[in-house]
Amino acid sequence: MNQLPGRLCGPSEGLIKMPMHRRLKVAMVSTLPPRQCGIATFAANLCAAIRRTDAPIDLEFVAIEHLNSVDDARSDVRWRISQGDRASFLDVARSLNRSNINVVCVEHEFGLYGTWDGEYHDHLAPFLAALRPPAVTTFHTVLPVPAPSMLAAIHEIAAHSAAVVVMTHGAARLLSSVYGVNPEKVRVIPHGVPVMAHDNASELRDRFGLAGRTVISTFGLVDPRKGLEFMVDTMEFVAARHPDALLLILGRTHPELRAREGERYRSSLVAAIQRKGLAGHVRLVDEYLSEQEIVDYLAVTDVYVTPYLDPDQIMSGTLAYALGAGKAVVSTAYLHATEALAEERGLLVGFRSAPELTSAVLRIIEEPGLRQRLEANAHQASRHTAWPNVARLVAALLQEVVDQRQRSAARPLVTGLWTPALLTGGRS
């Protein structure tokens, strides 16, 4: 297997397990539902999965909330941080120091933990520096060419974390080569996905009004970075060859985009659909989908697409879900897709290219053997990424960080020494 920075967390049977001899008190720092953002959904799913394991862990929530907002209010939140308020971060750090918390788990995205005024001002590193309990920080975005202020922020956050987690090997390499993060601190734990059994697909097709349709789908918060207009263009040609083809664009407009611009982008998609006469071939489902609804829509999907426009996107939760569902995927070649869809686990296309999207989608529809190979390879690659497995990996890492702090020894963490090539993207 290729030598990669960081130690690799694999399936539970690949772990050196440490005894969990007492209950851990863990503080989860993140946005949380009902706030509509990917990090909130991820944190909620991870915490629910940890609670369903046998790990002796008690979770407390530290919610990142909009300043002076009541929209994010939850009764089960013990601490609240006002997003953009550096003093609020430090106040909560001091409160955590007075608590019985053993370890802090942080879900990081730049917009949640800092502010911009021409350069990035990070609020997380001072928070971590003020903490007495050790912290594990998960980076959901790792940019290959960061602004100097962002590079410095990630370096400092990692320096004040006992361990850092990323979800792809590309991100692990960037942390080491670009940000100067000690590889011994870096763990690769895949994005979790629900356990999916698609034995009721026919019933679901009837419920959704999709019987007899070839379903192409994409889900997630809608915004211009998703490149959805190129899929609308694609459907003009796909529908001409396959009149039963239907594109489902599933998800609400990103709330921050809606606050700035209203529904301008969604309206532009609707106008294009009407102009091209595609009302019977493109359906926009303007809802924030629950986990079960996502699973149900994936069950009826024949081709999943992520026509995203940002080549530097290091992680896509929707792509992880589609692979976890064993779906044939077409995607632009952003960083996560390039790693995840290698070795015939999906088809990659160029950016902003309706012709390439059209060709790839038609290949999957018209070549049953190709579709079957893509589905089988996707399922095989994702078999260890179900939330129960990911939760056990995270729980073991949290325990190891606490054990290391208690031992006050310098030896590196040993959370996992082996990862299957299909899971990691490495080659054996």
What are these regions (language model features)?
Residues 210-226, 232-235, 247-250:
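Conserved donor-binding/catalytic core segment of Leloir-type glycosyltransferases
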